[in-house]
Regions:
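Glycine-rich phosphate/diphosphate-binding loop of Rossmann-like nucleotide-binding domains
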Residues: 21-42, 147-219, 231-233
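Short glycine-rich or small-residue beta-strand-to-loop segments that form or flank ligand, phosphate
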Residues: 19-25, 80-84, 181-187, 294-301
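N-terminal beta-loop-helix "entrance" segment that forms/cooperates
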Residues: 46-69, 225
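Glycine-rich phosphate/nucleotide-binding loop
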Residues: 3, 58-59, 224-327
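Buried hydrophobic packing segments
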Residues: 36, 40, 201, 292-300, ...
Length: 348
């Protein structure tokens, strides 16, 4: 099943090979992104990859986590496949993921979350789409020390961004035959900021009478998600709540190693693994490549290779269902390269 039907992508031009920025990332990034590239090639899709460095790897080589050549490449291609990037806690450079999303106005973060046969999870039949506003909220990064021991952080919510992400969510629901959009909020406490977000969602919802619209307070939504996730369909969230809830949803289906991610704007997109750099297993060749391969499938959807993307997703499902050639985190003994080869065999 296609994950991104109806999204405006970089459509193919007859006879032209699409050019895509490739950012392997840090830690296990090169291993899992390499797997995705191999699977895309095995599916018969030709892509002109422009490989660039970012994050800690780029900092060591170029003295900057976001080198000029990376930005130039992204401005040219307007689409990227990206691995995980190192972000230190409470020190160092700011998140490169957040920086790139804001720089290119990639305002919609989308994570399809589905259970997979062969993956042990507490639930069956989970089929959620988490849509997160990507450009403001506390992630605007406006914070300062007021006095020693006192720090202030500013939450920015605008009608423009809230309306834009709400319309994206409803358009997505319509294009992908979804039945319901639930706006997740904390307007009982943050009456102005979250209240504005809700009012914008409510106004947009009136334009989509065929899509059911609901609202739920974020803490209650988290409780409901871990007890009855099938009660949800498309989740619409502000930036911070979306970051937290999307990881919670990944936990319902086996973890971040099974969930792809995408960031969409009007003029481009970055497709990324949502898991971390996993430095404890980097270089050991045992990283789970599923999230990266499925993220590659999202890229193909965007490039108007939807049939090939579906073939890749089916091949991944075949390998997981069989359970014979899977990495240690899934209960197997296979290397990343061995599991990738199994997906390619299933693809053919």
């Amino acid at each position: 099943m296609r994950e991104t039907q109806g999204l405006r992508g970089a459509r193919r031009k007859a006879g032209r090979t699409p050019r895509v920025t490739l950012i392997p990332g840090d830690g296990v990034g090169p291993e899992v992104i390499g797997a995705a590239v191999k699977v895309i090639a095995a599916a018969g899709v030709k892509i002109d990859w422009d490989q660039q460095l970012a994050g800690a790897t780029a900092l060591r080589r170029f003295g900057s986590p976001v080198p000029d050549q990376l930005i130039s490449s992204l401005r040219s291609t307007k689409v990227a496949l990206k691995g995980p990037l190192e972000t230190r806690v409470s020190e160092g450079y700011r998140s490169i993921n957040v920086y790139l999303r804001k720089l290119f106005d990639l305002y919609a973060n989308v994570r399809p979350v589905r259970t997979q046969a062969g993956v042990h999870t507490p639930f069956r039949g989970v089929n959620l789409i988490v849509i997160r506003e990507n450009t403001e909220d506390l992630y605007a990064g406006i914070e300062h020390q007021v006095a020693p021991g006192v720090v202030e952080s500013v939450k920015i919510i605008t009608a423009r961004a809230s309306t834009r992400i709400a319309r994206f969510a409803f358009d997505y629901a319509c294009s992908n035959h979804r039945r319901m959009v639930t706006a997740i909020h904390k307007a009982n406490i943050m009456k102005l900021s979250d209240g504005l977000f809700l009012r914008c969602a409510q106004r947009v919802a009136r334009d989509y009478p065929d899509i059911e619209y609901r609202e739920q307070i974020v803490d209650a939504a988290c409780m409901r998600l871990v007890t009855d996730p099938m009660a949800f369909d498309v989740l619409l969230l502000e930036n911070l709540y979306g970051d937290i809830v999307s990881d919670l949803c990944a936990g319902l289906v086996g973890g971040l190693g099974f969930v792809p991610g995408a960031n969409y704007g009007r003029h481009g997109a970055i497709f990324e693994t949502v898991h971390g750099t996993a430095p404890d297993i980097a270089g050991r060749g045992i990283a789970n490549p599923v999230a990266a391969i499925k993220t590659g499938a999202l890229l193909l959807d965007y490039l108007d290779h939807g049939a090939d993307a579906d073939r890749i997703r089916k091949a991944v499902s075949t390998v997981l269902r069989a359970g014979r050639v899977v990495t240690p985190d899934i209960g197997g003994k296979a290397k990343t390269t061995e599991m990738t080869a199994a997906v390619i065999r299933a693809l053919r």
